[in-house]
Swiss-Prot record:
Origin: domain of life: Bacteria
InterPro entries (UniProt xref): Glyco_trans_1 (IPR001296), Glyco_trans_4-like_N (IPR028098), Glycosyltransferase_grp1 (IPR050194)
Pfam families for the chain: Glyco_transf_4 (PF13439), Glycos_transf_1 (PF00534)
The name this protein goes by in its record: Uncharacterized 41.2 kDa protein in cps region
Record GO terms (molecular function): glycosyltransferase activity
Species the sequence originates in: Klebsiella pneumoniae
Amino acid sequence: MNVIHIAETVKGGVATVINNLTENNEIDSHVICPESQSKEIYCAQKTLFSRTGRNISSLSSLFLVIIKTLKYNKFDVIHLHSSFAGFIVRALFAFKLINKKKYKVIYTPHCFSFIMDTKKWKKKVYIYIERILAKQTDCIIANSYYEYKCAVDAGISKNKIKVVYNAVSLDGQEKLERIKKCNENEVQKEKINILFVGRFDKQKGYDYLLNVIKVADVSKYTFNIIGDSVHDVFEKIEKENVVYYGWVDNKELPAYFCENDVLLMPSRWESFGLVAVEAQLYGVPVIANNVASLPEVISDGLTGMLVNFEDANKVVEIMDSHTIHFWNEKKEACREFASNKFRKSDMVNSYVQIYKSY
């Protein structure tokens, strides 16, 4: 079976999903992705396009690469990742520029655009587009039951949608040893180390994070912040207990998980929440905003806590009421929850069955 994955961007969880799927020996995989992000994709067969942002020249480059690649290669399945790739390819089908009958078309939005906290008229436009283009799709993959419900509520046929959780990989002896060492690490520290991983934007709740930092006692916590803004201007808090690391390579993240006691995830919306699952795999409990899909990826009270991040004082009050020993006691439960519920093999098998079924 020949499968081509098409992505306008592979940042974050998109790259993880594509890499997990293209490792499968049953499938001959090919990936179209941005040249600037190609190092994040491990598949040997890649076709690259020039991307400088979400602009006309970049989308035109992607459009031409898609047309050329599909013309000169034979694929059984086209797997579209995220909204822009989903729009371009399915629009080509709708306007008969590509023969839809030649392919099985799978679409993973990695968070529908209409889930975003945006203006009502924009949501209506996004919903209309997704409903129209669903006709050019054999199967739509929701990464959580929350995303599934949003899609059905938007008028997309539930018969078109399958739920497949994203996954974390337990492959490799080195990774297993690191997880074990991470769970055994209970060094006595003066402060609780708090980790944040994500873009500095509204979706990821960066403003909520800053509000928590401003209220929290400097003597009790160190905040380690991984990520950056998608824009040039953002508020950077200057306090002695706050450290900014910028973006780090995915392969380096485990070291940061092992050095921190708790992950903060104040997102306003998520279709899944991969960072929370990865953190728990390394025994790091999560304090997350009680919204969207996050209740599906955290076991409240067992592997972390679901709270309302709109009230920074309340969040800090909850943090203050628990010692580092309390968080350390959750390590094993975190690891078991993540490794049992979000297995890479389960995710890959689900996708392979979907490829074969349509």
